[in-house]
Amino acid sequence: MNKSTPANALKGAALALAVSTVLTACGGTDSSSDAKAEATPSATPATEVRDPLVATFDGGLYILDGESLKLTRTIELPGFNRVNPAGDEDHVIVSTDTGFRVLDATAQTFTAIEYEGAKPGHVVRHAGRTVLFTDGTGEVNVFDPADLGKGKKPQGRTYTSAEAHHGVAIELAGGELLSTLGTEEKRTGALVLDENNEEIARNENCPGVHGEAAARDEAVAVGCEDGILIYQDGEFTKIDAPDDYGRIGNQSGSDASPILLGDYKTDPEAELERPTRVSLIDTEKKKLRLVDLGVSYSFRSLARGPEGEALVLGTDGAIHVIDENSGRVERKIPAVGSWREPLDWQQPRPTLFVRDATAYVSDPSEKALHAIDLETGEKTTSVTLPESTNELSGVVAGH
């Protein structure tokens, strides 16, 4: 475990308690195709939808009622599109060919708000702010999601990376902005800026930096090809992987726990590694534990339960519920049939999205979507859709 103390390090009391962070995990560096993204609604929505979910399919978006799973709206949108919670009760961020667009999922229509830029990448929600990272330009946009309801682009903070790269950024409760460092060819670590975008900390001991998550007490982590890098209370700490190459590229955090859930890959030469182990990173003890599930999973398989429990959708079709403190698999909740991760990261595969105590799991092979009660393990609702879905998300208020 290695520490680096930043110049002008923050003194005094620890940072404010963290609130939950939702990670946008990804399996590659491109976030859209070359098709022009023009949204065409299939019909005029009659009423607002409750707790909407948004799923992508080849050619558009499905909007579903979060309680009944009724398909309430189909929006035609060419290209490879991605979806993430915007941070309020109504909106979802849609990554398209032209940039980030804001969908009013409750009203079932796109707003006029767009953050244009090539290769829109990670979307991060934390401490009352939503942060967008545009890979093609290195631009970071920060805004209060509560302002999205005003119908125009929120006033917010902007920062442009020294060089464009596949990156991620997060604004902390005290106004510090952590953003990754790199180029299109090489990513090396992260820096931290104060409220005036002046650098106050830096660590370049994180090769291949990718992904982000926050744990309790605002311990913010980014993944490396040889472990994980944590920023907390004004300083960086590196937790080394047990293998020379131990990549933790996707992570999921919870404000209910100091322990992060991550993937874990050990073969740098693999065209597609299908790992069976996940990582549990204790941000308090600065330790890393590996848990072997016995089955593989994908970057769309990681989530957290309402009490901080680690959830992994395995290729056996079950949600593996892991006690994040002991590393023990407590139970397996049947969700879908067995599946295999496709070589192309943009191709559909079963996806896990968790909101409160409900797990939503898509099954592209059956064109199905299921809602599962995490407490009872029972499927409460299922629906068959016209087309196979790819990404799955929904509105999530708060952080």
Where are these regions (language model features)?
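C-terminal motif of bacterial Sec signal peptides marking the signal peptidase cleavage site
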Residues: V22-A25
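Bacterial signal peptide processing site
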Residues: G27-D30
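Repeated scaffold domains used in trafficking and secretory/extracellular systems
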Residues: E38-A46, L77-D90, E114-R129, Y159-G174, ...
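Short beta-strand elements that form the blades of beta-propeller/WD-repeat-like
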Residues: E48-F57, L61, N84-R101, V123-V142, ...
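A short beta-strand motif characteristic of beta-propeller blades
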Residues: E67-E76, T106-Y115, G149-S161, N197-E204, ...
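Acidic, serine/threonine- and glycine-rich low-complexity intrinsically disordered segments
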Residues: E184-G305
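Loop/turn-rich, solvent-exposed surfaces of beta-rich toroidal or solenoidal domains
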Residues: G294-G337, E341-P364
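Blade-level signature of beta-propeller repeat domains, shared across WD40, Kelch, NHL, RCC1
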Residues: S362-H399
